[in-house]
A protein has these predicted regions:
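Membrane-interfacial amphipathic/re-entrant helices at transmembrane-helix boundaries
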Residues: 1-22, 270
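Transmembrane helix-bundle core of multi-pass membrane transporters
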Residues: 7-12, 83, 87, 91-151, ...
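Hydrophobic alpha-helical transmembrane segments
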Residues: 14-19, 62-67, 92-93, 132-137, ...
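Generic alpha-helical transmembrane segments of integral inner-membrane proteins
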Residues: 18, 22-26, 67-75, 101, ...
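Short loop segments and helix-boundary regions at transmembrane helix junctions
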Residues: 29-112, 208-220, 237-240, 264-265
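Helix-loop-helix "hairpin" substructures at the membrane interface of multi-pass membrane proteins
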Residues: 131-204
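Transmembrane alpha-helical segments in multi-pass inner-membrane proteins
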Residues: 191, 195-246
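Cytosolic-side transmembrane-helix boundaries in multi-pass membrane proteins
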Residues: 242-278
Length: 278
């Protein structure tokens, strides 16, 4: 089994898993804390519009996906601020519009879009050197941004109204974080696809949240959890010859419930010990 480690494509996959774990730990902690998971799902699915347009007009589908994810995120934010539009309705509108545009342009594109399943469901084993270089740059920038402006980001994530009373540039940081979310979603499309990418921005953070409370600790723990999820999914995909994206998500959910069970057992043991001492 360990012989698979000698293959270049698998080494690329491992490096991609590491970079995405670092990237999604930062962005996902903000997404979960700010309760933007559904909005993130809307941005991810809206990015299909850019993939379809890229195939039709002949430019990079990933570039189109990034543009649509960013516009989708800003559109969701703008609509949600309207008094006559519910936030979940805004997400549904952008979500379905982006996917519809993507389907139409993919259908109209000359020939058959053979790599469409890769964008939908992901394939971490198809990551190239150029993908890793772009993801490395994005990860380095995101880590710097989050640790340089940690106090502001945490305040905006937990209580944006309080942040405004402190004179913090809430709107500017919300826009910047929306841009980073969009780029993160696109950067992880190769791994798990449009349909599942939001899971990388939420499940490791939920697992970390079982044991930690502070934002910084959530980021650090979810880095480890996310990498373990990706490793487990990679090897499961190799052993069973099944799609890697789905395998990663299945492993992450299983580990979440395993961690939840362990926490419950430890809590009961602690409570029982305390009761006996009394």
């Amino acid at each position: 089994m360990l012989s698979i480690l000698s293959y270049t494509f698998f080494q690329y996959a491992l490096l991609g898993a590491l970079l995405s774990s670092l990237l999604c730990a930062c962005v996902g902690s903000y997404v979960v804390t700010r309760r933007l998971v559904i909005a993130g799902g809307g941005m991810a699915h809206a990015s299909l519009g850019g993939v379809g347009m890229g195939a039709f007009f002949g430019f990079s589908p990933l570039l189109g996906a990034a543009a649509f994810a960013l516009v989708g995120g800003l559109g969701i934010d703008w609509l949600s601020r309207r008094r006559d539009v519910r936030s979940d309705s805004a997400v549904a509108m952008i979500w379905t519009l982006g996917m519809s545009i993507g389907i139409l342009f993919a259908y109209l594109a000359p020939g058959f879009m053979t790599d469409l399943p890769t964008y939908l469901f992901g394939d971490i084993l198809s990551i190239s050197r150029s993908d890793l270089q772009l993801m490395g740059l994005l990860t380095a920038f995101t880590l710097f941004f989050f640790f340089a402006f940690e106090r502001i980001i945490v305040t905006v994530a937990y209580d944006p109204d309080f942040a405004r009373t402190q004179g913090l540039p809430v709107r500017a940081f919300e826009t910047a974080l929306t841009l980073i979310m969009a780029l993160t979603i696109v950067g992880c499309l190769r791994m798990v696809g449009i349909i599942l990418v939001v899971s990388l921005l939420s499940i490791p953070q939920l697992t970390a949240g079982l044991f930690v409370r502070s934002f910084r600790n959530m980021v650090l723990v979810s880095m480890v959890v996310g990498f373990v999820d990706c490793l487990g999914g990679l090897f499961l995909s190799y052993l069973l010859n099944v799609p890697s994206g789905a395998s990663i998500i299945v492993v992450s959910v299983v580990l979440y419930f395993l961690a939840r069970t362990i926490k419950s057992v430890l809590r009961r043991s602690t409570n029982k010990g305390s009761a006996q001492q009394v």
